[in-house]
Amino acid sequence: MEDFVRQCFNPMIVELAEKAMKEYGEDPKIETNKFAAICTHLEVCFMYSDFHFIDERGESIIVEPGDPNALLKHRFEIIEGRDRTVAWTVVNSICNTTGVEKPKFLPDLYDYKENRFIEIGVTRREVHIYYLEKANKIKSEKTHIHIFSFTGEEMATKADYTLDEESRARIKTRLFTIRQEMASRGLWDSFRQSERGEETIEERFEITGAMRRLADQSLPPNFSSLENFRAYVDGFEPNGCIEGKLSQMSKEVNARIEPFLKTTPRPLRLPDGPPCSQRSKFLLMDALKLSIEDPSHEGEGIPLYDAIKCMKTFFGWKEPNIVKPHEKGINPNYLLAWKQVLAELQDIENGEKIPKTKNMKKTSQLKWALGENMAPEKVDFEDCKDVSDLKQYDSDEPEPRSLASWIQSEFNKACELTDSSWIELDEIGEDIAPIEHIASMRRNYFTAEVSHCRATEYIMKGVYINTALLNASCAAMDDFQLIPMISKCRTREGRRKTNLYGFIVKGRSHLRNDTDVVNFVSMEFSLTDPRLEPHKWEKYCVLEIGDMLLRTAIGQVSRPMFLYVRTNGTSKIKMKWGMEMRRCLLQSLQQIESMIEAESSVKEKDVTKEFFENKSETWPIGESPKGVEEGSIGKVCRTLLAKSVFNSLYASPQLEGFSAESRKLLLIVQALRDNLEPGTFDLGGLYEAIEECLINDPWVLLNASWFNSFLTHALK
């Protein structure tokens, strides 16, 4: 369609149409039907006015090109196709000189003979429907409406067609030709169906009474009336010279617009310092599961029963000892806490009946680990407002940390496939309407690509842990409840599987506000030796608790089993979001859908099936120091999902700030790649705002390093 438009219409018309679309942020390459419609409308407006003049007696005459009388006055003033500001200026000056009522919308033409504005319509639908829409929109008796259709029909206000028969026939013939040309190229059907109803762009509401008085009172300084302010706003040209506009707005602003060139941007400065450490609420790639297949034991589905059953599958327990202490903590307490969990689980087994929940004894080690009695006493402000040296705690600035390689490994692992399926097909909601047939097809394809993904395991694990912790926090506020960390999946053969990752012990949880914190101690199984990357485990105390026999290609090998223990905390609002982690599936599905939509609109048919089934095609996944990484559509789905999941797992104010500020720089760089000649002011301030968020958060630091790779490749 785009090629057709460029061949079929005069280059000046094409250029005006492109400019008009850009002004409203639309892309002629994507919205090709709209591009064709705008060109057609422009051409009809120009043909309407061509060859029509007014002679000395004020009569309308037709003068063919090349006629010596061409110095006569044009009968029509063309308003359509002009810059908005210029167009309003023309309209205002016509109204001032002729006394005609000012229209609410920009009309297309002014007729000097009949002294009226004209609104031209070109429709692919019924002329009378379109006529009514136009009339409804402009609500003005004074503006004359004239509608043409591609089938040769026309309709005008009071059946007054303004022009002679021959001039109108020229327009109808041209429209018919355009239609035939489109049809012969197979473009007509899509063009005909794409017409929407009238779009209201620039209506001027009349404000009266009290609202009018309020409007006059609430104007910015230096404006005497609402009219005066409106005229100023209308004259504000969106693509004009920004410096001048800024200085008009305020005397204090002096912005120099600097052109943004390939050589302008510098890489983001990542902080120096010790390597960053793991801060997720549970272990990710380092987690180890004790699992039971096809669970059918008594009380199956009750977490404590499931946990005990999983613990019994392992026989390699040994006397625990500390292999990597926590720098600041009392490490023997972590060791005692684990021993207490083992002992209390043993007590349950020795008992008559297994209870549904287990509250731990409030031992000194657990009180210490859960920060019991550590919170400063709260005092009523009334009792202490007279204290002379009342002040807020001094809090230390966070220590800057450098990017460590482990976070990229975590991300890569999250994109990988596991040998189990973590979601059923219905995790993403059901169809409601027939239109959703395509949607459910897309959803099923997408689910097939991500159901086995490790990021999906993290979602289900996060949902489970947060739900269990929030429940316990509300149901057993004063108790140190033992909460197993469990997930469920299906094997490749479709057998159900229940997995135990470890345990959480919850502290006191009188959570009145969304941000009130509940402390918990997490104890998680792992085969990762913490001494390989001690910086990653700074916040953990790691115990060696057993030996596990693993089947490998060379036979069975024994590997030490570790327990990662740490004190952590969360809040009602964080748990609420954690319970909603399935939204990550939806977010990444929507990103994939927009890719499919873009492809479908280029091909002018739905390409969902080809998109997922054409295994040979590769898609851009992301930037790395090597360049743009590409992969299969499944890999794209899993990468987008992993990004969304990590945004949830590593949510933080640093991430919020970095995402918002770096996006501005990203848009400027993309504008440069699209040859839009972007300009900036205070680019230094933008860099400062971005880099202020690069402190110590592993996920933010990784995103910043990806951003630098993007800058390098984007500007080559």
UniProtKB/Swiss-Prot annotation:
Listed A to Z, the keywords are: Cap snatching, Endonuclease, Eukaryotic host gene expression shutoff by virus, Eukaryotic host transcription shutoff by virus, Host cytoplasm, Host gene expression shutoff by virus, Host nucleus, Host-virus interaction, Hydrolase, Inhibition of host RNA polymerase II by virus, Manganese, Metal-binding, Nuclease, Phosphoprotein
Domain of life the protein comes from: Viruses
Motif position, Nuclear localization signal 1 (NLS1): 124-139
Q: Binding of Mn(2+) 2: at which residues?
A: 80, 108
Record flagged with keyword Membrane: no
Its localization reads:
Host cytoplasm; Host nucleus
Task: Mention any one GO cellular component term assigned to this protein in its UniProt record.
Answer: host cell nucleus
Gene Ontology process terms (BP): cap snatching; DNA-templated transcription; symbiont-mediated suppression of host gene expression; symbiont-mediated suppression of host mRNA transcription via inhibition of RNA polymerase II activity; viral RNA genome replication; viral translational frameshifting
Q: Which family does it belong to?
A: Belongs to the influenza viruses PA family.
List the protein's name.
Answer: Polymerase acidic protein
Q: Which organism is it from?
A: Influenza A virus (strain A/Duck/England/1/1956 H11N6)
